[in-house]
Amino acid sequence: MIETAAADILAGGMVPLEMTQTQIFEAVQSDTLLASSLWINIALAGLSILLFVYMGRNVEDPRAQLIFVATLMVPLVSISSYTGLVSGLTVSFLEMPAGHALAGQEVLTPWGRYLTWALSTPMILIAVGLLAGSNTTKLFTAVVADIGMCVTGLAAALTTSSYLLRWVWYAISCAFFVVVLYILLAEWAEDAEIAGTADIFNTLKVLTVVLWLGYPIFWALGAEGLAVLDVAITSWAYSGMDIVAKYLFAFLLLRWVVNNERTVADVASGLGSGSRGGAAPADD
């Protein structure tokens, strides 16, 4: 039976060098804990898409609409990416390099998560930056640093030639993350005060920073790093953070935008813009 063979593969930690997509799919599905961490996100992403479309049906202000579009892209990207993961399309078994706790073993690597993050987290930052009344330069810097963080994180996960190089890529990714944190905690926090959106911004800022800090921590503890946690546990940690950092975050943001559309419009017209030094609002 393929299911039994897949279960033996995961249990033993050793797999053939060339697994077909069907074999990877069976391996993922045979691990109930791992598979459930993916299916739950597909279900919640689908429900979130329907809910957010309904919430935004009467929004008329262009800036508020742009926030809605950026936020709606988050579950749209997630449902696509998690479908890729659950199908085995964006999952590989990679042999860990010498020095790794699982050196020589083929470890399931759901690298498709990095595609999710590279496409969805910039949308989160765009939505938050627009809410804060940020200018184009800060938005661009945050988004580029965020994409750099995700791409170098992917490089860390896929590097099999050297265990040290995996951690070098990890350190570079964390450096990009520091740039994102600085903009969120310093630049945009001040902009939001000027824009009159500080209350909701501070809530979203804390939610984002606390949860996003969890990703590099679980990477380091998971099979890709120190291998203290197995693949299924790490997958649930990522999925749990995704649920709160994406869907709950998006709901809180969009609910506030719907109830405070006039405030958002004032930011767009420059009445509360946090763009200091005469810089234009991000959507001008």
From Swiss-Prot:
Residues carrying N6-(retinylidene)lysine: 246
One record GO biological process: phototransduction
Keyword Ligase in annotation: no
GO CC field: plasma membrane
Cross-referenced Gene3D superfamilies: Rhodopsin 7-helix transmembrane proteins
Chain ranges passing through the membrane: 31-56, 63-86, 111-132, 136-159, 163-185, 198-221, 231-259
Extracellular side: 1-30, 87-110, 160-162, 222-230
Family statement drawn from the similarity comment of this UniProt entry: Belongs to the archaeal/bacterial/fungal opsin family.
PROSITE patterns per record: BACTERIAL_OPSIN_1 (PS00950), BACTERIAL_OPSIN_RET (PS00327)
GO MF, one example: monoatomic ion channel activity
Mode of membrane association: Multi-pass membrane protein
Keyword Transmembrane helix appears in the UniProt entry: yes
InterPro entries attached to this UniProt entry: Arc/bac/fun_rhodopsins, Rhodopsin_retinal_BS
Record's subcellular location: Cell membrane
Cytoplasmic side stretches: 57-62, 133-135, 186-197, 260-284
Name this protein carries in UniProt: Halorhodopsin
Keywords: Cell membrane, Chloride, Chromophore, Ion transport, Membrane, Photoreceptor protein, Receptor, Retinal protein, Sensory transduction, Transmembrane, Transmembrane helix, Transport
